Amino acid sequence: MIKRVALWQAYLAVGALLTALYVFVDPFAGSGPVINLLGLSPVIAIVVGVRRNRPASQGPWMWFAIGMTLFWLGDLYTYSYPRLFGADVPFPSLGDALYVTVYPALMAGLAMLIRRRNPERDRAGAIDSLIMTLGLALLSWVALIAPYLHDDSLTTLPKLVSIAYPLGDILLLAAAIRLAVDTGKRQPSFYLLTGAIVALLVTDFAYGLVTLQGNYHGQVILDVGWISFYLLWGAAALHPSMRELEQPAPERITRLTPL
């Protein structure tokens, strides 16, 4: 008997195929329309997932849809600008304004999700996430934020925008760690969502490093990291377990602190 392919699996399979075309196959290699289509896909996936799976609270997912829409608009501007104007995208640009506003939208959704997963005060979980976030934030400070602050070639606005990206990533990192140490249920949608956040953070960090070194030339490998972020987030919305993502679970032994 042939097993029926789930919608989220089909979504990932089609996304992987389009990604392969984007990376390896002319004339699709590095194509703006292809990556823009991939960037739009999580927005559609979230809308479809909410309608099909009917989570008890749609608020977090609506914020996620807003954040992904802003990310897609930033991509649309960034990849269309050279074709429309025959020049490199300036920095900072409208695209940067759109990208930076992604962070508060995603954080709003994650904050709502965390509150619903943890209806009782969880001091130990909060302290654990703070400890781990501070450690990784220090790495971001040393590798990215401090070098941008001391870069005399940047004027005030470019410097502020450059710093906004790693600061936004630190906030998302804090939310991802808080999800990882909380008492909520661990379902496939949970792992897909946290995987999406990790993909974004790792790719943004790598992009920041190569940009600081002056070695960024539109490397496709970085685009693959952002595409992974799109697809994993979209799959998290399509998976039926997204209904249970906001549900708390009995106390788990996942603590660093004994509180």
PLM region descriptions:
Residues M1-L259:
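Polytopic alpha-helical membrane-helix bundles and their juxtamembrane interface segments
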